[in-house]
Each structure stands twice: as structure tokens, then as C-alpha cells.
Amino acid sequence: MARIAGVNIPDHKHAVISLTYVFGIGKTTAKQICAATGVAESTKISALDDAKMDEIRAEVAKHTVEGDLRREISMNIKRLMDLGCYRGLRHRRSLPVRGQRSKTNARTRKGPRKPIKK
């Protein structure tokens, strides 16, 4: 298994699919990386030599991926919570942030029902 950005990439899959195992790289970005490095999308990772793998690693390094991306996302949420804006309050209360109804639905975000104590 090859390692890119600290993630084990499966050898037996196509290059585009294998690159999506890295957090922050979807199918579109994987296609762009393959085009920039000159690797055919249908090429298996096991068929690539070390020079091509180094090119792919260099191209992936240009993007924000894995731990840096996770940290950036959590810092953005923390910033909203510190500002005290509406979105930050919704994050703080573990409620839906993007305007969904929460009277009857939103069980995933709110968690299991809590009984009313008498």
C-alpha cells in the first residue's frame, strides 16, 4: 500500500478512486490531480513508479487535507461559537445550523429523546 498525506492508499484500485481515501480530496480534486501529474484516471496505483507517486504527493501537498483540514473546520466552528452569532449558538446547542425544522425532526443532531422529569 502506498502512503499519501499519511493515509494508506489501496494499490488495487484506480488512481482517482484511491486518492479519494484522503480526507479533503473528492472525485473532482482527484481528477484534477491526475490531470496535473499526467496520470491516466484508470491507472492502478500499483502500476505507478516512484517518480509518479512523488509527483502525486507533491500535488496533494498543495491542497489542505487530513489533519490541517479537520483543524481548520473545527477552528471555523469555534470562531462562530465565540462570536455568538446565530450559527454559533446553534452549534453550541447541538441543533441544526442551516435552517431545518427542529420541532419534530432533527433527531440525529439532537440525540436520543430525554424524558421529562416530574
Swiss-Prot record:
Positions of the UniProt region annotated as Disordered: 93-118
Describe its function: Located at the top of the head of the 30S subunit, it contacts several helices of the 16S rRNA. In the 70S ribosome it contacts the 23S rRNA (bridge B1a) and protein L5 of the 50S subunit (bridge B1b), connecting the 2 subunits; these bridges are implicated in subunit movement. Contacts the tRNAs in the A and P-sites.
Q: Does the keyword Flavoprotein apply?
A: no
Question: Which top-level group of life is the source organism from?
Answer: Bacteria
Q: Which organism is it from?
A: Teredinibacter turnerae (strain ATCC 39867 / T7901)
Q: Which Pfam families match?
A: Ribosomal_S13
Task: Enumerate the Gene Ontology biological process terms.
Answer: translation
Record field: transmembrane: none
Write out the similarity annotation: Belongs to the universal ribosomal protein uS13 family.
The answer to whether the entry has keyword Chaperone is no
- Entry-linked Gene3D superfamilies: 1.10.8.50, 30s ribosomal protein s13, domain 2
GO terms assigned for molecular function: rRNA binding; structural constituent of ribosome; tRNA binding
Q: Which NCBIfam families match?
A: uS13_bact
Extract one GO cellular component term from the record. Answer: cytosol
Q: Output this protein's name.
A: Small ribosomal subunit protein uS13
Entry keywords, A to Z: Ribonucleoprotein, Ribosomal protein, RNA-binding, rRNA-binding, tRNA-binding
PANTHER family, sorted: 30S RIBOSOMAL PROTEIN S13/40S RIBOSOMAL PROTEIN S18, SMALL RIBOSOMAL SUBUNIT PROTEIN US13M
- What is known about its subunit structure? Part of the 30S ribosomal subunit. Forms a loose heterodimer with protein S19. Forms two bridges to the 50S subunit in the 70S ribosome.
